[in-house]
Amino acid sequence: MSLPRTNSGTAEQNVAQVAQAILDGRISIIAGARQIRRFCGGHAGLDERDPDLTTFVAIDSETDDLPVGDVRQYWAPDALAQKDLEIARCEAMYREPALEAASHLVARFTRDT
């Protein structure tokens, strides 16, 4: 799954893009959470205490030890196989709250576009 391009537009637009990609199944929940987390706090301007964003901040925090994306190339196959089981478990566990939060974010952040 490839990540959506999020290097232009407002933080809200970028989050809506990632959230839609999660809903469409184009990116995983964990990968999407990591991207959404980048737009929270600091210079990005989105408040990570927002209930819908908090869902993704929490998922990112709880799964930050899991190899998702390009870092997988640096992992040994046997270790990766074990982590893949944990990734699958986490994706299933977080699926419902992530999809709910993603749908809220898309509705909120695409309302004015």
Q: What do the predicted segments below correspond to?
A:
Residues M1-T113:
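Acidic, Ser/Pro/Thr-rich low-complexity regulatory regions
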